[in-house]
Amino acid sequence: MLLTLIRDTFTPSETLGKLYIDRKFFCDTIEPPVVPNAQHPKGCIPLGWYKLQLSVSPKFGRLLPLLYLVPGFQGIRIHAGNNRDHTSGCILVGELYHRHGVPGTTCCGGESGGIGRFNERGAVSLCDPIVERGVPTLCHSKLTEQALVDKLKNETNQHEELYINITDTDRYPVERAILDGMSNLADCK
């Protein structure tokens, strides 16, 4: 299963994008701004391919996707939030009411605009198609990210693996052409 996040709007205060599941649009995203050579919490995570795992978040107390082996970052989750101030380095999912600095959009309130309709539904509904595909779930809320990575390395996984490709509008057409030529996602490793 492949999630693709395409970043398409960059401002000094936030990065906006669109999240796709197996190339079908799923929702909008908000992340921290792009900061060259960023280390959490200054900017968003670097472009690239990352493995995902569903696990119970100690902070939120429910099943959420966790990106792991992200250079310079730990505990990067995909979860709901209302605006860029709620990212803490994570990827917020929802439906954008306002694309900051983009003419012709509607602001839902506040200078930063916001993301709505996903306060409780967003990340939970993102988990639904993942669980339906048989991707394994870790329900160990007390595991650190390193313990989670170690556990995953030691398990033989016969289930479908979950990846996220974080890219931008300049790189995506080339990546898509490459993916179209591959027989399966395992070729990406």
Please name every model-derived segment.
Residues 1-188:
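Cell wall/extracellular polymer interaction/catalysis modules
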